[in-house]
Amino acid sequence: MVEMPSIGKRVKLVADGPAGSTSREGVVLPGAAQDHITIKLANGYNVSYPFDMVKTIEEIGDSSTSESANLSIEQNQDLPKVTIIHTGGTIASKVDYATGAVIARFEPEELLASVPEILEIANIDAKKIGNMWSDDIRPVHWNMMIDACQEAFDSGSVGVVITHGTDTLHVSASALSFAFAGNGGKPAGRIVFTGSQRSSDRASSDATENLLSAVYWAANGSEVSGDGDAAVTVMHAGSGDGICAVSPGVGVRKMHSTRRDAFQMVNGERISEISISREGLSHTPVSKSQNREVTKPTKYDTAIKIAQFIAGPHLHSDLIEAAQKADYSAIIIHGTGLGHLPIENSNGDAPENDELANTIEHSSIPVIVANQCINGPVDLNVYSKGRNQQEIGVLGHGSTASPEALLAKVHWALSNGKDLTILSENLCGENESSLMN
């Protein structure tokens, strides 16, 4: 058997296959299976062969993970200043050929070296908050992002780009929208969230176009109005390349686990689209009528806990009771249809429905309903069941926000002493009133 090279070596191998011998060049990664050799090809894809299929293998060099670590890159100080705030995710990452894993690449020099076109758009500053999976992000990290954005604006940045894992990117975008515009104001510059659905080691990665478009919008986008654009997301508009969508942070949601165009609007429209071509980047016109004043951001009380449940056959009163006993501050239930809950017992054979209704009516903490349909309003005036829910104290009627935007809104309201009757109001673009007419 041919002697296998160590991980990280660049090799040329010849292996047997169903169609005969095949020659491949790439970098050796940890084997995808026992007794296999795996190499990363120049096109970004990985291939694996059983050891006994490899006829010859030749080392042709090493692959370094730090080849750009000591780069000194000169920036154009005349361009708009944009601060990139990194929280994690794959958008600012590269392959560690010693382990085969995707690792953070967030020294500013390395980031600029990987996407040098950014230098033609903006003068880049960078700050690293962390390198977290987005599902590990908590309200304390929202506050860190808020502070980092305000510091960037205070230091002269016209916009910030927050690189973020995609799974909860829309949740953080909602949180910052309320922080900067929930009180009727707006941030001093553009706040742009972006991420990558496909890791940067894949040929189909969306990282470069998303990052380019996000920096472009942070530097050159429309003036912030505070109504839907206090924080925006910039991600692929379709499955193909060339167009990225600018969407309200409070109006967008990740709707697919893997597609590059996973981020879709909920009950609203995109703000703009950015075209990427050989001639450069450009965006469709934007018209905004509001003229809010720039205000300092508010924060989130990290001691607040909000329970979330799903309405359906297994929603029972003991869940509501448990949340109260555990000192939760509020409960959000993702209701069916127009926001309904299983609280009626018309046949007389479902006493758990009566128990649920009684527990909600006497709850010591707010019980709020969101729309598990995602699109459409919570309208508790259409059917008698909805009116009954309002009579026992269920809140949320009139909201058209996504469940994630509603979660951020409830947390923001509780953190800042607001009455939860504001859930039906449009504070910063989260509610589309036309859906209730």
Residue positions per predicted region:
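Short beta-strand segments
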Residues: 85-87, 162-164, 192-195, 229-236, ...
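ATP/NTP phosphate-donor binding region
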Residues: 5, 36, 45-46, 53-151
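Gly/Ser/Thr-rich loops at beta-strand to alpha-helix junctions
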Residues: 86-92, 164-170, 238-240, 337-340, ...
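Short Gly/Thr/Asp-enriched flexible loops that form oxyanion-binding sites at enzyme active sites
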Residues: 162-189, 343-356
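A glycine- and small-aliphatic-rich helix-loop capping segment at beta-alpha/alpha-beta transitions
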Residues: 98-105, 174-192, 207-213, 252-255, ...
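C-terminal non-catalytic interaction/assembly regions of soluble proteins
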Residues: 2-75, 338-437
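Internal gly/pro-rich beta-alpha loop/helix module
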Residues: 47-49, 195-276
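Accessory alpha-helical/coil subdomains and C-terminal extensions
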Residues: 85-86, 96, 107-108, 113-118, ...
